[in-house]
Amino acid sequence: MEMKIAGLTFGYSNIEVLKDLWIDFSGAQLISILGPNGVGKSTLIGCICNILQPKSGAVYIDGTSVRDIPVKELAKMIGYVPVSTSDSFPMIVVDAVLMGRHPHSKWKVEEEDLKKVYDVLVRLEIDDLAMRNFNELSAGQHQKVSLARGLVQEPRILLLDEPTSNLDIRHQIEVTRILKDLSREKDMLIIMISHDINIATAYSDNVLLMYEGGIYAAGNPWDVITKDSIRTVYGVDCDIVDYKGRPRVILDQTIANHKATDWVPPYTEEHHPTLMKRGD
């Protein structure tokens, strides 16, 4: 499976949020999108899954623009789990998760659908919630149920907007590890937005660092997460240490005077990276 983002530009009114993005993705892997608030991370996810329509450029899956793929077929190819949900389902958790099977089974529930649901609930350690009312769950439990719904959809590409934001640190680590494992087991490209740099770099095959509506850097975590990139993008000083073969950010107390007013996104049609699965 290959996905290509070609010259993607998006804006609200006269304000450009994404500016001429170029990047390719190839193979099953876990990719984390990093960057401060307001740089276009969620907007990029929205354009990939065709919720938002770019002003120019396009997103291609195996050579076909997502705008040209019928909605039902696109739902089988791309799953999307938003950062938070205002969903209010007067139903039990099993039924809420079963909604993710709709692109495959429509509204007829088969035994195989139920098995897939329970397998995912067990994997996410929420099988004890199966018969609970969805509306009675905590924010963190809601988030895991929403993730379960995305996983049972079994898409080729799964897009997650801060899937661990309401979870405690143990479950943040556990969910991120599960996502990496599932990318291998299900031959799936999983792209998640994260604000935890250290957890993201510990488990991601590649990372994409966004800044000012563009891609500051993308690739191997060691190539992307550097003292200079953290200083420029986040405006803080730090040290980078090697922890079990992965970069770990140790923050300084200093707020850096970093504003790069002349920064230009480095990737173009002629020169942009292809993010491929790394060797474990």
Where are these regions (language model features)?
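ABC ATPase nucleotide-binding domains
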Residues: 233-280
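Helix-to-loop junction immediately C-terminal to a conserved catalytic motif
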Residues: 49
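Conserved ABC transporter NBD signature motif
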Residues: 25, 57-65, 74
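Conserved ABC ATPase "signature" region
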Residues: 98, 111-129, 154
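Conserved ABC ATPase signature
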Residues: 133-137, 141
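Catalytic Walker B motif of ABC-type/P-loop ATPase nucleotide-binding domains
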Residues: 158-162
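The feature captures the beta-strand-to-loop junction immediately N-terminal to the Walker
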Residues: 34-36
